[in-house]
Amino acid sequence: MATKSKSSVRGSIDDVLDDLLGYDDEGPAKSSQPAGVSSGRARGSSLQASKKSFLEDDFFSKLPAEDMEAAEGSSISDADPQAVLQTLKEMDDMEADLLGMSKPSSGLGKAATKGPGKFSTSEGAVKTSGKMPAPEKGESAPEMDKKPLSSPPTSRQYRKFNFEDVDDPLAGLLSEEEQDAPRKPSPKGSERRPERKTELGKEKDPLPPQTPLHTTAPARRREELTFEDDDDDMMDVLGFGDGQKGDQKHGKKAEEEEVRPARSKLDELLGRGSVAKILERPGAGEHREFKLDKKYQKQPEKEEGWDEEDFVFGAYQPTVATTPEGRPSRRQSVSRFSAENSSEPKPDPHSKPPPAASQSPARGSRAGGDWLGLKDEDFLDSEPPSPAKTSPVVSSQQLLAKEQATSKPNQLEEDNWLSAALSRKKAQAQVKAQERGAVPLETTGKGLDPSPAVSQPATSTGAAAQAAALQDKAASADSSGHPVPWLSTVTQTSAHPPEPAKRDPLRDVSPSDPAASSPAEQGMQGPAPLAQVTMPSTPLQAASQLQAESPPLGSVHERRPGAPTGQSYEDATGCRAALLSAQARVAELESQVRMLELERTQHKLLLESLQQRHQEDLDLLESAHRSRVKVVEETYGQREERLRREKEQLEAQLLSQSQDAERARADLVAQHKQRVATLEQQSAQELERLRELQRSSVQEMLKDHEEQLQRLKRLKDQEIDAVTSATSHTRSLNGVIEQMERFSSDLHSLSHKVEATHHTTSQELAMGARQRDEQLKVLQDRLSQQQRDMEEERSRLQEVIAKMEARLSEQTRLLEQERWRVTAVQSKVESLQRSLEEQRRLMTQQLSMERAELERAKSALLEEQKSVMQKCSEERRKLAVEWAEFHTQQQLSKERMERDIDRALQLDSQREGTIMSLAKEQAELKVRSRELKVKEEQLARDRLLLDEAWHELRLEKEKVKGATLRIRQQEEEIKNMSKLSAQKYEEGERALQDACRIESEHQARLQVMQQHLEQLKQQEQHLQQERLSMAHQRRQLEQLHKKLPNNPTLLLTTDQDLSASTKGLSSTLSFPPPIRTLPGHRSVGTTASMELYAKLLVLKHRAQQDRNFLEDEQLFLETLKKASYNTSPLSV
């Protein structure tokens, strides 16, 4: 919540707590004004002022700045070190005040100078911390109550009103000193206040003249001891003060003085001296006077009655008790009251009771009588004049003149009233000057707490004359509008503080020590005046006490146990003097009470209107915020739904497209596989057919070749047999041999031709096989390349599919993360809402506990005051009954005000919570909007990615189409290759046919050769026969040689014939010629056999060549078989 709203709420709570603590049924809120009227008045004015500042100071326009200031303040630790030290120091001072512990008297002199400094220090501490540490840290209510008692300057800084409008209807209800005090030190501040009062009095028309009877410093101190003056201190310590902005407070206190003169007027009307306030005030920002607005003041003719009877029933003014360092104690005021009433002084154990002669008589007289307006004339005959009391009387008269100088524009009537009062005092002093000497000595010797009113009438005639002169000077100074000159003299007298050490602790503040009494002292002295009001024994004495002259009566009653002889006489004279003034004063007070009641009703009406307007503003704000939040939520919900639908559509499209691509890929792969399978099957079939053909052809050729070899072997064997069986004895074989030679030469040429043709055909077949193998290898390479291309395309398609699936999984994961993040943010928001509700509940509980503690403190104070009141005499009971009646009315009004303030607090807390929730909701909406923008950007990027994926799929489709085209081209090439292979097959068939034809030719040739061989066999048989015949002839010839050895020529011829025949035969059949048995011709036979042997070797060599050729052909065929078997699986 904004700090300004908190400050205004704290100001209103200050008044409530003042009511709870200060306005008990027997203790008035302020000492110098009636308990009911003054407290109700002050509370009404402060409440109105706080509400005015709360509702009219442009609250809603300043909320953002205040939120920034609160954030800056909250960033620092709440428990500021300076604030904690100040709190501890103030708690020590408060304990000393409560226990009556005396402190160094030098604090009296320091209070005047250190007041503003303390104020600024605590103000800075509050500004640093942003809040008072006590309420936020959960401190107990009693500790909070102690702070305002001990440190009024620190806590008074929190009271801040920002009334910049001079025409504010509540302006006249606020004290001027509350605005002007923080900017001035004590002497200067006291001098400037009369000027402001005079100016305000001139600005406001119907301002009636106020009673200047509260002219003494004791009266001022009593007013400072009231509980209500401490209200702001207590509330500031509790953390509800207005001091978060100390700089603004200094700048606006002057305006608050101008718009709040009603409190000071009421103080003057009800017996509270404004001049004493100016003198006693440390000038550190404490506002104590309550000046009534001009329209609420009485007419000049009524002022004399008011001056004579300056206090209503039930109110009183005790002597001022100055605690060390200017901090008062409420319990001291109560003890002072009990000491005065019961005539049994009970000073605190830490304070020594001084003799009555040591205290200032003038101060005591002012403390007892000036607050009732009776002055010294009513009890001049009670005691003889004392020389030690003359000078204080003069100072009290000077204070009276200062009060007149600070009063409002109707100063002439006040001067008339003062002159009449002074004349009465002079007459009483002359009549009763001889009867006063013994009573002060008696009271001081007894060690009681004598009433200052008893010593007050002891002034001499010269003192009265001085007082009259001072009053004339005050009147002239007030009419000129300048500050009174004796303020400086009063501040000069503050340099003599040793006197309080000799006095009773309850009256330790002298009139010349204005800075020694702090606003907390003035607030603490409230209960004692109430007790003094109820002291008189008769209704007449009560009326005289209400007027302003009850302190002498109170002092007489207090001295009653100690000095019974002189007291009866003084009671009689006091009653006679008080009876005359009480009657007129009662009428004036009744009229004043009616006027205050009217004013209170007006304030209530104004408060209700302001609250109603505030409630309407809050409702309007809440409704506007709700509508805005609803619209924002609807828009974001629609946007989120639209994005969700788009995302689902994109996912569906992506899924369908991916499925289509997968189906197309599967179809293409299936078609490609089918085509490859068919092509492989066809190629395998063709290769198998070629292998079968080649195998069959090679087998047939092998069979044929083996048959030919067998035939040749048979022929060779037959030839060898024929040669071996041929005889060499026939010459007719020569022709046959020649023919055989020709035949053999022809056969050799034919064999060479067959070998050449066979070699050429085999080479052609090998070349054709090699070409087919090369073609098959090329086809296999192409098929393998196509297979690799298909595998690569398949892997690429699989990679594309995997990428698409990964992208889909990533998108789903991101969506899940976003969903979880949104749920986490929602849970955080719900937890924050629950924590805020819990904090609000704890704050309400804490406030209720604090309120209960305050109620208990109030009940304790009530019990204490009741116990004191029970000890009073029978003469006060009637006045107590009247006070109780009036107090019940005040309590009713107080309760109504409390209810109003509670409602205001609730409204403030609700508004604070709503504003905080609005700010958080706005921040959350901004965060959600940013997140939605990020989601939109992500979806846009996903859409781009999907477009790219679709583009890649299109490219892949194009690639697949290109691959299909390439496959078709390869199929065409395979078809062409199959055609070429068919052509090659046909060529091979033709070559086989040629080989068959050649083989048939060879067959025919072999048949011819067989025929020739048959013929040769026949010839060999014939030759064999001839050889046999020749052998027979040779034997015959041998026989003839034996018989005829002398005929060598015949032998030679026969040998030649035989050699010729054998030579022909050996040359034909390559057999060695037969060995000649002729002894003379053995060398010729060996040569012939050698020739035959050579021929046989030649034939064997040819047979070996044929055998080697056949083996080579067989190896070639086997290699062809192996090559065909090896190429078949490759083609497959």
Swiss-Prot record:
Q: Which InterPro entries match?
A: FBF1, FBF1_C
Q: Name one GO biological process term.
A: establishment of epithelial cell polarity
| Native source species | Gallus gallus
Q: What does this protein do?
A: Keratin-binding protein required for epithelial cell polarization. Required for ciliogenesis.
Q: Name one GO cellular component term.
A: cytoplasm
Q: Does the keyword Coiled coil apply?
A: yes
Protein known as = Fas-binding factor 1 homolog
Polar residues composition bias: which ranges? 331-341, 388-410, 534-548
